Amino acid sequence: MNFNSSYNLTFNDVFFSSSSSSDPLVSRRLFLLRDVQILELLIAIFVFVAIHALRQKKYQGLPVWPFLGMLPSLAFGLRGNIYEWLSDVLCLQNGTFQFRGPWFSSLNSTITCDPRNVEHLLKNRFSVFPKGSYFRDNLRDLLGDGIFNADDETWQRQRKTASIEFHSAKFRQLTTQSLFELVHKRLLPVLETSVKSSSPIDLQDVLLRLTFDNVCMIAFGVDPGCLGPDQPVIPFAKAFEDATEAAVVRFVMPTCVWKFMRYLDIGTEKKLKESIKGVDDFADEVIRTRKKELSLEGETTKRSDLLTVFMGLRDEKGESFSDKFLRDICVNFILAGRDTSSVALSWFFWLLEKNPEVEEKIMVEMCKILRQRDDHGNAEKSDYEPVFGPEEIKKMDYLQAALSEALRLYPSVPVDHKEVQEDDVFPDGTMLKKGDKVIYAIYAMGRMEAIWGKDCLEFRPERWLRDGRFMSESAYKFTAFNGGPRLCLGKDFAYYQMKSTAAAIVYRYKVKVVNGHKVEPKLALTMYMKHGLMVNLINRSVSEIDQYYAKSFDEGYIN
């Protein structure tokens, strides 16, 4: 038999004649040859697509795959620290790149960390870059028409009213008194219980409870009692946290997908629906109760919480705000006041343990302030329970610098979103079309050598000091509190809250992270620690405090 003749076949022989062959062996070989040719064709197509996608990476920062766009790279980034991944991409692309999502998806966006671009969209061309429909639709179920999800007149009205209230004497008195109560009569006893039992404690959870109670007092005028000796589970607090966690998933998922999940009531959409019901039930009950109380009191000015203030106002038609609108206002302020400060403090204490020289300088600064009191003396310096007053808190420049440095490296809101209202061009030359989405990466901004220098990854509070006094940076370089017309209204209060809490803890305890505890950010609206912050607390001895007190006489020690 001539075996060579079995392989000497034409294309037509393979695809049209093989079935008529009477030789089973030849038939099998023909089918095998056809399969090999198809496989070779598929491999060639894959190699071509891969080479094309990788070539696109040179110009667009990431490979661009047919149909999928840059989604595979995003999926890879989501497996680890998504914010570090994004920072690396932005660094390679000189601060700006255009993300391409799957075909027919809503994930296309321009991402930037260039301060020139950030100032352009937050200040110079503010009216061209509203939150936009994409952002509002993703968070409408949770935030409704509240200040962080609103644009135009709705946003302006809420901001104007809140701004007046935030600067009132009654509001400052409310915040000062409520914070003192929470820190010295609830927080410290909880921490002391942990010390006495020699058991670790989740400091992030404790701080979230503290700020949650504090902001509920300010926003709703109620005390949920979240921070207590037995660390009770508060349904509203749990529902609120679950809702924010589920809502953020919409930003990394095509709109059609999460809407389909919502229709089927499955996955994160089911969780979001259930959580928002818990939030709404709490808010509705508070609003109903407050209306009854005010009808009996007959005068809204006796209270200074935001809910009562807005209840006393009228809309453009002269009518009272709806319960839904009141709910949206309060939920938005709780989101801002609860998460941002507590998350920032958690990262601050983690960084503090890694940088003991910073902790020492904070202690020296506090001892110096105690020494400067009119009634200072040996009794004062050895007093283990000092209470720092508002004016003394303001003098803590180095502590504020350390907190700002923590916020630079780990901003509470790592990214934020805008939508382009009309065709525009960024200062760096990036072209923007009407309807485009823009993301400014606040986390990445703190890690750019071009912005902060070669030591940008170091925790160095001294970069914020000028002749020993705290000096803030441009809001378009340090964007932890946003910038332009949307600059955070509660910035001063947030610093006061963080400084008061940090001072009370640092002066009394050394905070040591539990060995082996993994610290990494969680994908959420704010940058929670994914596994909390498990720490052991150690009481400071009087002799240790005396050593810091002695160093406080050296005027140049902190600088």
From Swiss-Prot:
The protein's matches in InterPro entries, at most eight in alphabetical order, are given as:
Cyt_P450 (IPR001128), Cyt_P450_CS (IPR017972), Cyt_P450_E_grp-I (IPR002401), Cyt_P450_sf (IPR036396)
What does the UniProt entry say about where the protein is found? Endoplasmic reticulum membrane
As cofactor, the record names: heme
Q: Can you name a GO cellular component term?
A: endoplasmic reticulum membrane
Q: Name one GO biological process term.
A: cell wall organization
Q: Which residues bind heme?
A: C488
Single GO MF descriptor? iron ion binding
Q: Does the keyword Transmembrane helix apply?
A: yes
Let me know which tissues express this protein, per UniProt: Expressed in roots endodermis, anthers, stigmas, stomata of young pedicels of inflorescences, the placenta region of siliques, at the level of the hilum in matures seeds, at the junction of siliques to pedicels where abscission of floral parts takes place and in nectary glands.
Give TM regions: 31-51
Traits of the deletion mutant: No visible vegetative growth phenotype. Very large reduction in alpha, omega-bifunctional C22 to C24 saturated suberin components in seeds. No effect on seed coat permeability.
Q: At the top level of its lineage, which domain of life is listed? A: Eukaryota
Alphabetically sorted, this entry's keywords are: Cell wall biogenesis/degradation, Endoplasmic reticulum, Heme, Iron, Membrane, Metal-binding, Monooxygenase, Oxidoreductase, Transmembrane, Transmembrane helix
Q: What is this protein called?
A: Cytochrome P450 86B1
Record lineage: Eukaryota, Viridiplantae, Streptophyta, Embryophyta, Tracheophyta
Question: Its encoding gene is what?
Answer: CYP86B1
